[in-house]
């Protein structure tokens, strides 16, 4: 699929909105998949958290669909990758791995890059799309926080060091790199200490 580009031209902004909409659509499926696949073995509050996440992601997708319509496009108008869903398939039998890879790596990456996208859209004069992306960014902090909280719950339940276990799972299940710069304030707000991910990024860069 085409790479996401900076939001300069109308075509680039449409492509970027489409790419984010695709991520949000996958995130809807992932939120409900984690409930259906793992909810029975977890406390009821786990299901409550991910139902709320799924509701948020559906609203995000709807908002992005409206913005795509406003720029004479629609979801499905462009090719899309399956990387996020591939991660779901790879972690389909391991809840800890699912939490480590999807919310704590992939969604946390959104916290790193979305503020720049907001600035790009504002700079291009598309304040409506910028506001949608800002809303998504602010609400995604809670989604990363839910993943981090439940990962730490599993670590405590299994008497494991959460930081070490997270790094082991990322090395095993994640095929990409943890790219700097990190949005450390947003990640910290989501309950992710720098010691979880920054040494891991350096290790992956060295491979």
What label would you give each PLM region?
Residues 1-207:
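Non-heme di-metal
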């Amino acid at each position: 699929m085409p790479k996401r580009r900076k939001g300069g031209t109308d075509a680039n902004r449409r492509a970027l909105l489409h790419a984010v909409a695709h991520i949000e659509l996958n995130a809807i499926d992932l939120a409900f998949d984690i409930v259906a696949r793992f909810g029975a073995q977890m406390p009821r509050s786990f299901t409550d958290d991910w139902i709320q996440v799924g509701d948020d992601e559906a609203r995000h997708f709807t908002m992005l669909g409206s913005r795509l319509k406003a720029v004479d496009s629609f979801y499905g108008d462009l090719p899309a990758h399956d990387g996020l869903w591939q991660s779901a398939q790879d972690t389909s039998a391991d809840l800890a791995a699912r939490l480590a890879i999807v919310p704590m790596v992939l969604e946390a990456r959104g916290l790193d890059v979305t503020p720049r996208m907001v600035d790009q859209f504002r700079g291009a004069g598309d304040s409506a799309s910028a506001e949608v992306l800002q809303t998504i960014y602010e609400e995604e902090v809670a989604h990363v926080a839910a993943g981090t909280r439940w990962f730490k719950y599993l670590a405590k339940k299994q008497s494991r060091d959460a930081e070490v276990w997270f790094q082991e799972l990322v090395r095993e299940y994640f095929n990409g790199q943890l790219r700097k710069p990190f949005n450390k304030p947003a990640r910290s707000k989501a309950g992710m200490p720098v010691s979880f991910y920054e040494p891991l990024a350096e290790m992956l860069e060295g491979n």
